Amino acid sequence: QGVDYVNFIRKFHDKIFNVHLKDVAWSEKLVDAGVFGGYLNFGDYRRFWDFRSLGRGNINFDNIIRALNDIRYTGPLSVEWEDSAMDRVAGASESQDYARKIDFEPSAIAFDSSFSE
């Protein structure tokens, strides 16, 4: 919907208690159905957007995790899996593995601190 999700994290940092991970892919060109998809089922090539397994869509999860680390978020990352083109068990497992891979610990020291010594 055009929301800057990284800025949203920074702006509402004190209101975030659970993070819901879900990926989506959207078309780079005009298609038969607009942004809201209307009457078309998920998985229909004429849709403007569709859900994807984590890491297979357009969402920049690296920037999301960095923003969450910046606000010192330590709560859960939950995965909601949806991808009409993939087997459910394989896709959900792949998404779970991806979520574990992208969830890196923030640095315990300031990178630039060594330059001030």
Question: For each of these PLM feature ranges, what is it?
Answer:
Residues 1-55, 107-111:
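Acidic/histidine-rich catalytic cores of soluble enzymes
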Residues 7-16, 63-73:
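Acidic (Asp/Glu)-rich catalytic clusters
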Residues 24-26, 59, 84:
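Short Gly/Pro-enriched loop/turn and capping motifs at secondary-structure junctions
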Residues 88-109:
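C-terminal helical cap(s) of enzyme catalytic domains, especially alpha/beta-barrels
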